Amino acid sequence: MATPLVRKPAVPSRTARAGAGPAPPRRVSLSLLLPALCAVLLVSLVCGAGIGASGLSWSEVLRCLWAGLTGGRIAPDQVPAYTIVWELRFPRAVLAAVVGAGLSAIGVAVQAMVRNALADPFVLGISSGAAVGANAVLIFGAFGTLGIWALSTASFLSALLAMMLVYAIARTARGLTPLRLVLTGTAMYYGFSAVTTFMVFAAERGEAARSAMMWMLGSLGGADWASVPIAAGAVLGGLAHLAWSARRLNALAMGDETAAALGVDAGRLRKELFLVSAAVTGAVVAVSGAIGFVGLMVPHAVRMLVGADHRRLLAVAPLVGAVLLIWVDILSRVVLAPAELPVGVLTAVIGVPCFVLLMRRRSYTFGGA
């Protein structure tokens, strides 16, 4: 009986394998990445409290942090160190983490909302609207009766007014469309920026104009414990809503028709995302100024690590953004000590080359492939 011939499967040639395209990149396991990022965040917070021009020892820094966290007593000779660590540096590090987390998460949401790889939290024009209120306080003394709350209150109120204006112009009978949102937000950005620039040039030269310019470039120099709860509450609320909407974000990122086929109301979801993004951006910008590039760069970098699934993106991006902004703020304090650089300047200096390197990678696409 003849033995049947079994044809061996052909082995693809090297040329054929090369022409098949790059293999999909490996994704980092969240079970390893999340604990590592949490540990790095804690270390970064301690470093943010310990690094500065005053030259405190690490034992003093840890002692002051422990006293502040537990409510313990400190020796009279340690009061200056305690003031520096607990009242000045540590709230600043915490606020940097909150702002970085908020900008990164909203960057992910806005890019999905408008399906544009160049979108960031400021594309909606909210930050430039907040700058109008901030400059009114810094230059002209508006809301002076509110004391320390004047700057954040005026910034947040003007951000809300900007949000309402953008929404009113961009909205149509079909709801909010990505193109109208981007175009309206961009137009409002330039319009509000022109107003703030005019306010700075109309002001008398001096400390007020300098403070306004620092705020417009982003600064955490005015951070204190009073400014943390409002920003943290807005960011945590926004993160909770985005995490709950992660599956719908995956559908929206594939297009309105695909989202509708999957049972997702794209118009309603886009409206929710707009309101959440505007509220979080307004709260964050009110306490930190306009810190750019974090909400643009971090989402793209995280996509390369964990892919385009928004459930993974929204778990990792806030932690990466928090760590990034803590260390950028540390650099802003020590590069030209005792002078201080605007945080937004350093985020651009660091972000531009990093972003260019990301875009140079052949395997990277906006969808995370």
Set out the residue ranges of the language-model regions.
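Alpha-helical transmembrane segments in inner-membrane proteins
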Residues: A2-A369
